[in-house]
Amino acid sequence: MAKDYSRTQRIGDQMQRELAQLIQREIKDPRLGLVTITGVEVSRDVAHAKVFITVMGQDDAERVALNMEILNDAAGYLRMLLGKSMKLRSVPQLHFHYDESIRRGAELSALIERAVAEDRRHGDESED
């Protein structure tokens, strides 16, 4: 029987919590926006971790790229801090990726709202 909650998922969840605190407390770069860790995917061999982030209130591609650059530059430092806080034999290399799912979700919600409003408008016109 397969495990419902694998070791890599547990490591990813713990890394997500730890990284959220470490980025907030340890990264002192004033250019860094309000970063939210939306998920961490750890490879099966625990050598690499994809860290998905969003940046609060910054949809500008240039600002997002700057935040990604800052985090990727600090990846080694964050990895060292993770090694101290987590009891792992080897700490995965961190690879930061921008999570566009929230932006896409907001766009889809706006499209649905527009479609519903248009249907209501057409429904009101046909009743007249």
UniProtKB/Swiss-Prot annotation:
Transmembrane segments: none annotated. The keyword Cytoplasm applies. Its main location: cytoplasm. It holds the Pfam family RBFA. InterPro entries: KH_dom-like_a/b, RbfA, RbfA_dom_sf, Ribosome-bd_factorA_CS. It comes from Pseudomonas paraeruginosa (strain DSM 24068 / PA7). The keyword Chaperone does not apply. GO terms for biological process: maturation of SSU-rRNA. It is found in: Cytoplasm. This is Ribosome-binding factor A.
